């Protein structure tokens, strides 16, 4: 069972929910927020194994190249530019699709590999923790995410997605059997929750909502969920003591009130999702 945890916007508490819930239900933790992965701060896994993530990029053989420019014309990402003297490659724009090589009539293109990030795997007690880390300055996270999700552990996996509803999240949802949407009771939270709801509905996934940073003065999220017939899996109150524990890199389920809340969320999960 792979459960994706996502949000329409950043800062709603995806990683808070993912890490604490993984310890309560005994699920493996998979951090797909590869541009800013921070789940390991809280789970602190040991026995870390690392593997580089590499992508293809074209290499021009100047002895064969006639500067016809066919490779540049066919590139949909403008990674290749023909000048009077050479073909210039903007390697960070290249998606490694090989269209340029197919278009070249003179076999002047071969492919090399370059490293764009790493995938790490470790242990937190009996749980397996995995994360992808994109190198600073690299624009494309999807190859790292795909590498990370290629061989998921057996059992239940919580997939901590990137914020938003971009292609990074779409690629993560392709491996999911269900989704948890984490939101906050603000105007921006509701706006972006609606986008996330539309996305998971397009994937036809069972899903529910967790309201984080809750205060009783604002019921906009509950009203929206009622109108849309969306399951509310749990409500996590806004408390100073939780923020203090979190700021120290510790799990909020260490607090009795929050442990009880996450145990109730775990029960609701089993009711909403086709658990096996």
Predicted regions and their residues:
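Walker A (P-loop) phosphate-binding motif
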Residues: 1-25
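Short, well-ordered beta-strand core segments
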Residues: 4, 27, 157, 179-180
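Ferredoxin-like iron-sulfur electron-transfer modules
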Residues: 8, 21-25, 44-67, 78-96, ...
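Short beta-strand-centered segment that lines the nucleotide-binding/catalytic pocket of NTP-utilizing
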Residues: 27-40, 113-118
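Switch II (G3) loop of P-loop NTPases
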Residues: 31-33, 131-136, 145-169
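Iron-sulfur cluster-binding cysteine motifs and their immediate structural context
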Residues: 70-89, 99-115
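Inter-motif core of Ras-like GTPase G domains
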Residues: 168-187, 193
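C-terminal lobe/tail of nucleotide-utilizing enzymes
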Residues: 199-276
């Amino acid at each position: 069972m792979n459960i994706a945890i996502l949000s329409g916007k950043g800062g709603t508490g995806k990683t808070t929910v993912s890490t604490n819930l993984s310890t309560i239900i005994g699920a493996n933790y998979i951090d797909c927020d590869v541009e800013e992965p921070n789940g390991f701060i809280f789970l602190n896994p040991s026995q870390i194994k690392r593997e580089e993530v590499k992508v293809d990029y074209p290499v021009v053989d100047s002895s064969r190249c006639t500067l016809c420019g066919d490779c540049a014309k066919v590139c949909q990402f403008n990674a290749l530019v023909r000048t009077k003297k050479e073909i210039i490659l903007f390697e960070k724009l290249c998606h490694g699709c090989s269209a340029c090589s197919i278009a070249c009539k003179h076999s002047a293109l071969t492919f090399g590999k370059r490293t764009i990030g790493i995938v790490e795997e470790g242990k937190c007690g009996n749980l397996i923790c995995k994360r992808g880390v994109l190198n600073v300055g690299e624009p494309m996270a999807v190859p790292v995410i795909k590498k990370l999700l290629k061989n998921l552990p057996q059992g239940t996996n919580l997939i901590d997605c990137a914020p938003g509803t971009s292609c990074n999240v779409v690629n993560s949802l392709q491996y999911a059997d269900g989704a948890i949407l984490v939101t906050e009771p603000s105007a921006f939270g509701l706006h972006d929750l609606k986008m996330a709801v539309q996305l998971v509905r397009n994937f036809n996934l069972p899903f529910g909502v967790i309201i984080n940073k809750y205060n009783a003065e604002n019921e906009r999220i509950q009203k929206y969920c009622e109108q849309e017939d969306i399951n509310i899996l749990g409500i996590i109150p806004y408390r100073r003591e939780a923020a203090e524990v979190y700021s120290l890199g510790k799990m909020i389920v260490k607090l009795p009130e929050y442990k009880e809340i996450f145990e109730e969320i775990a029960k609701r999960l089993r009711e909403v999702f086709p658990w096996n």
